[in-house]
């Protein structure tokens, strides 16, 4: 009799724990990833809603100036007419559309470090962590970037 209750209690506790895990993962992934996100502690991007999609612009750079003290420009852009744009304030993510719960697909990411525009998909893995798959053509040949959200980020005017 006690053994039966013990097993029943363990099963109930395991079921409750499983429901809590499922509820937590759904609540984390149903959030919209608007806010400030850090890429590799070098770039902060503000992700925002734009015409029903997600976009992102650079709001902070670890090194916003050239060694000569000039603002960093988009010098590697394949379009010569855009090479004088400042990196600070530059929109580098656009077109991300909501897909399955917690996923955004169909977006583009412009990387000013190489002047290439990539396809991007994103998934909010926790309320403070986003995984972005960056690729050209097929996702399997791309790279994954982990972004960290921190609403308390303090910027010292480096952008």
Locations of the language-model features?
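Bacterial N-terminal signal peptides that target proteins for export
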Residues: 2-14
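Bacterial N-terminal signal peptides
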Residues: 12-22
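N-terminal helix-cap/turn-to-beta initiation motif at the start of protein domains
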Residues: 23-36
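Central antiparallel beta-sheet cores of small beta-barrel/beta-sandwich binding domains
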Residues: 34, 39-119
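Structural motif
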Residues: 50, 125-126
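Residue-level recognition of beta-strand termini and adjacent short loop/turns
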Residues: 100, 126-128
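Low-complexity, intrinsically disordered Gly/Pro/Thr-rich segments
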Residues: 128-136
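Edge beta-strand at a domain terminus
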Residues: 137-159
């Amino acid at each position: 009799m006690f053994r039966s209750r013990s097993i029943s209690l363990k099963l109930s506790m395991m079921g409750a724990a499983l429901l809590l895990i499922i509820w937590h993962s759904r609540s984390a992934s149903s959030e919209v990833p608007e806010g400030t996100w850090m890429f590799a502690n070098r770039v902060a991007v503000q992700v925002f809603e734009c015409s029903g999609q997600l976009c992102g612009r650079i709001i902070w750079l670890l090194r916003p100036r050239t060694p000569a003290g000039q603002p960093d420009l988009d010098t590697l852009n394949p379009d010569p007419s855009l090479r004088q744009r400042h990196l600070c304030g530059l929109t580098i993510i656009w077109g991300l559309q909501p897909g399955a719960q917690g996923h955004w697909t169909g977006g583009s990411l412009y990387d000013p470090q190489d002047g290439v525009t990539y396809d991007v998909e994103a998934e909010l893995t926790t309320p403070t962590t986003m995984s972005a798959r960056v690729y050209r053509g097929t996702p399997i040949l791309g790279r994954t970037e982990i972004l960290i959200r921190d609403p308390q980020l303090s910027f010292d005017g480096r952008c």
